[in-house]
């Protein structure tokens, strides 16, 4: 199994460094904590190899590291276009996506956002932007080239450049806590399946990872990791998904 999952002798795992649902990087020590760190640590222990965790700026970077053979596994939310480039495991967690709006916004629930004349923002390449482009029928979806900083996003919402912004609930809860003039809607517009990804075409490797995830979910490892990280709107994936 070690030769299949970690051919260099070290398990190399890439994750989205800007997504707190996957993990956080300590600014002083640079150590990674959160579900990604806990899952990689346990997988490496079972395989019997050391590991490294590689921060990546976005989904394209994670896929690029896999294709360049500089990472053995990656962590991404499932979507069909990405599945044409990499193979996805069964999900280990479900990440809820919601909107953040101005505190005085008339938008009270997710369905209110899909109205003519409203501008809904999301970041390019994120699972939320893919979902919103495919599913909003009346509102204008504005795709930003990168995830804006909290300060930039607050300015866009307060100035009226955007009426709402879609992202994972954990990210939005953190943003609203720091900016009282913003609020997160109480409901969610979608749930993204957080999975492990590998290069395409190796069914035996994928089977090993799927068995590991099934065990990690059934044993409570994933739930414990989510609880320890104090993540909002994230749950261990139930059995039988994909």
Where does each model-flagged region fall?
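Ligand-binding clefts/hinges and TM-proximal coupling segments of bilobed small-molecule sensing domains
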Residues: 3, 127-147, 180-185, 214-242
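A ligand-binding cleft/hinge motif common to bilobed small-molecule-binding domains
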Residues: 60, 76-85, 131-134, 158-190
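Flexible hinge/capping segments at coil-to-helix
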Residues: 92, 101-120
